[in-house]
Swiss-Prot record:
The keyword Zinc does not apply. ATP-dependent carboxylate-amine ligase which exhibits weak glutamate--cysteine ligase activity. It comes from Streptomyces avermitilis (strain ATCC 31267 / DSM 46492 / JCM 5070 / NBRC 14893 / NCIMB 12804 / NRRL 8165 / MA-4680). This is Putative glutamate--cysteine ligase 2-1. It comes from the Bacteria. The keyword Zinc-finger does not apply. GO terms for biological process: modified amino acid biosynthetic process.
Length: 362
């Protein structure tokens, strides 16, 4: 059974006003007072963000429970530092991001200017174990067209600087400003993958292989494929669903590779259009079907994803969990829909944020 780990980035906000607060250093200090050897929480690009990482899990119920536990611990440490945590992929309220300055981030600030300054976005990264780089590259090649569906399911960033962006996942559009971000062409072999990464680093435009921000990549730290397209999800059960589907995609792709089935050869241009459509429409409109690359009702494309990974989900014991979670998500709506409904009901972005703080805990 493949292990799965999740990394989530959370927004630190004022519990009264909902405005982001640059208190990550204070929050981490509280976490380290409790456990000097803690390795769960760490700083991110901006001081208004906090990241946590789960341990690798094979059981999805255990992974979901750990996500909830980490969020609650983050909330406790944040409360002691004078702020709250919100699983929001962008700040609904206007904010001037505060870059957490170390040598790496200083280099990035000088290199990328306003694109770096405005990159106050919170994502969810899923690591799924692979047996080798050869299997990993085969997986990366085969999951490419399905990743926009994860964008739509996780979409949780409708607001930007106090305005409705008209997108369901505006975070993914902001993230796309990085020069190395986005979908990839077919690699075909680990040699070609590693050669491309080395060539990208050699340009000097990016600092190292950690800044190769492919939608899915071989992790440079773990024996995993890292899927990097999702917004941080408002509700923990949605994060668990994204991880479940990610493992299903990886396992299905590995099986296709071993069976000699070739990957879809969609161009990067088409994949970018699919990603844009998913960010714009989320679950409320139409998506591009991963095989035909033609518009289809979002629910139908989500059902196609479930069918595509169905055997892998069943073999892992995750089929019922995935179907139930998808049904609930389609009924309730993704985070973007929830945020917009909160604003419509309360008339206040501040109240929207404070309610999202509550819902972050599950």
């Amino acid at each position: 059974m493949r292990t799965v780990g999740v990394e989530e980035e959370l927004l630190l906000v004022d519990p009264e006003t909902g405005e982001p607060k640059a208190l990550s250093t204070a929050v981490l200090a509280r976490a380290e007072q409790v456990d000097p050897d803690q390795d769960v929480f760490e700083k991110e690009l901006h001081g208004q963000m906090l990241e946590f990482a789960t341990h690798p899990q094979t059981d999805m119920a255990a992974l979901g429970a750990e996500i909830v536990r980490c969020r609650k611990e983050a909330a406790r440490h944040a409360g002691e530092a004078g702020c709250a945590v919100a699983a929001l992929a962008t700040s609904p309220l206007p904010v001037s991001p505060s870059i957490a300055m170390n040598r790496r981030y200083q280099w990035m600030a000088e290199q990328y200017g306003i694109a770096m300054q405005e990159q106050l976005t919170c994502g969810c990264h899923v690591h799924v174990a692979v047996e080798s780089d050869e299997e990993g590259v085969a997986v990366v090649d085969r999951i490419r067209p399905w990743l926009p569906v994860l964008v739509a399911l996780s979409a949780n960033s409708p607001f930007w600087q106090g305005r409705d962006s008209s997108y369901e996942s505006y975070r993914s559009r902001v993230w796309g400003r990085w020069p190395s971000a986005g979908p990839t062409e077919l690699f075909g072999s680990p040699e070609r993958y590693h050669r491309q990464v080395a060539d990208m680093v050699a340009t000097g435009v990016i600092l190292d292989d950690g800044m190769v921000y492919f939608d899915a990549r071989l992790s440079h730290r773990y024996p995993t494929v890292e899927i990097r397209v999702a917004d941080v999800c408002l509700h923990p059960d949605t994060a668990q669903l994204i991880a479940t589907l990610a493992r299903g995609l990886v396992e299905s792709a590995a099986r296709d590779w071993r069976a000699g089935r070739e990957p879809e050869d969609h161009s990067v241009s088409l994949l970018r259009l699919a990603a844009w459509q998913a960010a714009r429409a989320g679950l409320s409109g139409e998506l591009l079907h991963p095989v035909t690359m033609r518009r289809l009702r979002a629910e139908s494309v989500v059902r196609a994803l479930l069918e595509h990974v169905g055997d892998a989900l069943a073999d892992a014991g995750d089929l019922d969990l995935a179907h139930e979670a998808v049904a609930e998500l389609l009924e309730r709506g993704n985070g973007a829909r929830v945020q917009r409904e909160l604003l419509e009901r309360t008339g206040s972005l501040r109240d929207t944020v404070t309610e999202c703080v509550r819902q972050t805990q599950g």
